[in-house]
Each structure stands twice: as structure tokens, then as C-alpha cells.
From Swiss-Prot:
Gene Ontology MF: a single term: ATP binding
Top-tier EC class: hydrolase
Residues noted as binding Mg(2+) in the record, renumbered to the chain: T66
Annotated catalysed reactions: ATP + H2O = ADP + phosphate + H(+)
Organism: Bartonella quintana (strain Toulouse) (Rochalimaea quintana)
Protein's name according to its UniProt entry: Holliday junction branch migration complex subunit RuvB
Annotated PANTHER family: HOLLIDAY JUNCTION BRANCH MIGRATION COMPLEX SUBUNIT RUVB, PTHR42848
């Protein structure tokens, strides 16, 4: 996005919240199923004295994918190397990373769905056979070279599982989906961060921040910092519900965690397109925002909260969105939603889906 939003779940440069990240699995709050499974896999790998199988984290930004990757390396007692898909532009970039890894090291690739397809082809034998196949030279003088690699663990993160190719997905032995946090979990995180900041906060103050944090710890930490700024200037001795509510209201973050851009998104569909359906490209053009930003940052929370519905024909506002905006839904919109729900029910009646079956609509 062109302007940094307060409620962006992407990390900011020099973000002070980086220093608040937990260092061990037992200190990590939330994602209980993921933590429990990771603990078992890590203990098993250590007992066998082998590299942990490759891990793929799937979920919206800000839920702890990078933090969990760092914790995994520490729990395994190995080195941690980090990069991202768009940064690996040439085969030489990937070769330099892989050849510098030691036995059982963890290599973390964020946004792996943005990896160049040519680079992805080189990654396949590296993940499966721990070998690097490179072509040296050009034309008739070109020759293939195989380089043996240390047995490493690739930990990848993506917000868009549907953009990963099937061969790449199949090479990850441990797929883990991270979900939005509950308000109770976020309250605990806010209180913990406040203690680390040496700031006094009441239970209702922590609750007020947590319920507006969009289910995302990174956003909760950012909101806490801004509320601390207000409390300091207002000379409040303690952050209670009144202080938190006043600060967040002035920042235009409402009680459900929606900011002006979220409301623009909902109002656009409601007023311009009468509740939808409307295509994502049309929404992106009308909001002057990249499609990826809308799909990765704005829509996941709106979908999770039941404000919108994705259909084959486009996005549709649901009843909760109309109520939140204080608007009346057109009668045609209600019948369209019922039809879309019926179609979705029929589509899903054939069987259950797994993590690998999911794709972005």
C-alpha cells in the first residue's frame, strides 16, 4: 500500500515490537495446536539427530510465522538464516544461501509464493535430495554441475497457499496453518508487552486494545504503543478502558478493529455496487490499492468477521456489514446472498478439504 496503515499487519522498519518476540515455544502465546505439533516434531528430530522435515506456515501476516521459525532454530540448537521470495532474483542467490548452510540449519523463506519459477525449479532437488543442480556457462560450452548440500530444514511462509505450485507444496512434510488469535489471547499479549514497556494497564484497558487488534499480535503491539503515546501526553497514570477508547477512537479504529480503509472498502461495495457482487480488480481500481494488498491485508479479517463473502462472481456484503455501516441492504442483495450460500453448500457437499486442497478464490 502506498501509505502505511496503523492496522497493517506487515512489519514496519525498526519496529520496537521485534524485541518483544518470545524466544522459546513455551513463551509463545496462542496457536496451541501448531505449538503442540511443532514441539513433537522438534523433539523427534533431536532424538533421531536428523534435520527436521521441511515446514510450510500458511496464514495472514502478523500471526507469528517468522517468530515460530526463529524459535524452531533455537529449540533445535542450529543456525537460522532468513530471506524472502522476491529477494532471490537469480539462481546464484539461492546457491549462495544453500551452500553456506551447515548440517540441520534452518533456512526461512518468507513470501515463498513470490519466488521466481526458475528459482523454484532449482529448489526442488535441494529440498528432496539435498543436491544443487546448476548450469555453468552458455551455449555449447554449458555444463551441468551437481553440488551436495548439508541436510537442512526449509521453513517457508505464505499468505497465499493457492499461488504455490503443487510440486512445491508436496515437498513440505509439515504444513501448518496459523489462525487469527482470540481476544483473550491478545489480552494476555497486550498485558505482557505492557509489562516489558514498564507501563501500567488495567484488565479492561488491555481488553479494549485486544478487541480492536483484528486478531493479530503485531497489530495489538502497535496499538499499545500508540495508546501509550496518548497516555503519556495526557499524563494518565494507568491505561484503563477510558484512555484506550479515547486514543483508539481518535486514531479512527472502531470497536471491531476496522479503520478508514476498511470502511471505504465496505462503503464502496454498499453504495457504488449495491452490495455486490463486484470483482476484486474493480475494487482495487476504485480504491487505488494493489490487488495483493486488498487480498492479503484487508479481506482476511473482513472474511473472518463475516462482513463479506467471496463468490465466483465477486465480493458480496453480508448482513453484518450492512448493520455495522448503519445501512439497509437492498432486497435484491439478500436474495443474492441466499443463492450464493446455497451454491457454496452444494460445492462443499462432496467432501472435506485438507490444507493442500485450499486455494484463494
Amino acid at each position: 500500500m502506498k501509505d502505511q496503515r496503523l492496522l497493517d499487519s506487515v512489519p514496519l522498519p525498526n519496529d520496537p515490537d521485534r524485541s518483544l518476540r518470545p524466544q522459546v515455544l513455551d513463551d509463545f502465546i496462542g496457536q496451541e495446536a501448531a505449538r503442540a505439533n511443532l514441539k513433537i516434531f522438534i523433539e523427534a528430530a533431536k532424538a533421531r539427530q536428523e534435520a527436521l522435515d521441511h515446514v510450510l506456515f500458511v496464514g495472514p501476516p502478523g500471526l507469528g510465522k517468522t517468530t515460530l521459525s526463529q524459535i524452531m532454530a533455537k529449540e533445535l540448537g542450529v543456525n537460522f538464516r532468513s530471506t524472502s521470495g522476491p529477494v532471490i532474483a537469480k539462481s546464484g542467490d539461492l546457491a549462495a544461501l544453500l551452500t553456506n548452510l551447515e548440517e540441520r540449519d534452518v533456512l526461512f523463506i518468507d513470501e515463498i509464493h513470490r519466488l521466481n519459477p526458475a528459482i523454484e525449479e532449482i529448489l526442488y532437488p535441494a529440498m528432496e535430495d539435498y543436491q544443487l543442480d546448476l548450469i555453468l556457462g552458455e551455449g555449447p560450452a554449458a555444463r551441468s554441475v551437481k553440488i551436495d548440500l548439508a541436510k537442512f530444514t526449509l521453513v517457508a511462509a505464505t499468505t497465499r497457499l493457492g499461488l504455490l505450485t503443487t510440486p512445491l507444496r508436496d515437498r513440505f512434510g509439515i504444513p501448518i496453518r496459523l489462525n487469527f488469535y482470540t481476544i483473550e489471547e491478545l489480552e494476555y499479549i497486550v498485558q505482557r508487552n505492557a509489562r516489558l514497556f514498564s507501563v501500567q494497564i488495567s484488565d479492561d484497558g488491555a481488553h479494549e486494545i485486544a478487541r480492536r487488534a483484528r486478531g493479530t499480535p503485531r497489530i495489538a503491539g502497535r496499538l499499545l504503543r500508540r495508546v501509550c503515546d496518548f497516555a503519556l501526553v495526557k499524563r494518565a497514570k494507568k491505561i484503563d478502558r477510558k484512555v484506550a477508547d479515547e486514543a483508539l477512537s481518535r486514531l479512527e479504529v472502531d470497536h471491531l478493529g476496522l479503520d478508514p480503509l476498511d470502511r471505504r472498502y465496505l462503503l464502496l461495495i454498499a453504495e457504488t455496487f449495491l452490495g455486490g457482487p463486484v470483482g476484486i480488480e474493480t475494487i482495487a481500481a476504485a480504491l487505488s490499492e494493489p490487488r495483493d494488498a486488498i487480498e492479503d491485508i484487508i479481506e482476511p479479517y473482513l472474511l473472518q468477521q463475516g462482513f463479506i463473502q467471496r463468490t465466483a462472481r465477486g465480493r458480496i456484503l453480508r448482513e453484518k456489514a450492512w448493520n455495522h455501516l448503519g445501512l439497509c441492504a437492498p432486497a435484491s442483495t439478500i436474495s443474492t446472498q441466499k443463492c450464493a450460500q446455497l451454491l457454496n453448500t452444494q460445492d462443499n457437499s462432496s467432501g472435506q478439504t485438507t490444507l493442500w486442497d485450499e486455494a484463494d478464490e
